[in-house]
A protein has these predicted regions:
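Short, polar/acidic, helix-capping and beta-turn segments at strand->helix junctions
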Residues: 1-120
């Protein structure tokens, strides 16, 4: 049976070092059998961030890729927290935020970058 690490390799995803929190909080906390994840940003491996409002400063596809990047960062934090991603049974809740220009209404299309990664 393939592992999550195997699947990440198939997708050419290498988990980065988990991004350092930008404030007085931790990236993840385990309570019983649940792991609660703090909000994560669009930290790129070079330390910069994906920024801008959809669709003015970045395209809907760029927002999708940014949400996917957040998912990769969260997986890195989760792996650091629990050691083995195969221990994860289910993603219980996702709260995604999109910086968007007035009138933009297709927020789910961006957040799907995260959701699709979790499904993959």
């Amino acid at each position: 049976m393939a592992t999550i690490d195997d699947r990440l390799a198939e997708l050419s995803i290498t988990l980065p070092t988990p991004p350092a929190p930008l404030g007085n909080y931790v990236g993840a906390v385990t309570v019983g059998n649940l792991v609660f994840m703090s909000g994560h940003g669009t930290n790129k491996p070079d330390g910069s961030f994906v920024v801008g409002r959809v669709p003015v400063d970045c395209s809907q596809d760029e927002a999708y890729q940014a949400a996917r990047l957040v998912g990769i960062n969260m997986l890195a934090t989760l792996k650091e927290q629990i050691g083995d991603l195969d221990r994860v049974q289910r993603v219980v809740k996702v709260l995604g935020m999109v910086s968007a220009a007035p009138g933009f209404e297709n927020h789910p299309a961006g957040i799907n970058g995260f959701s699709d990664l979790m499904v993959d």
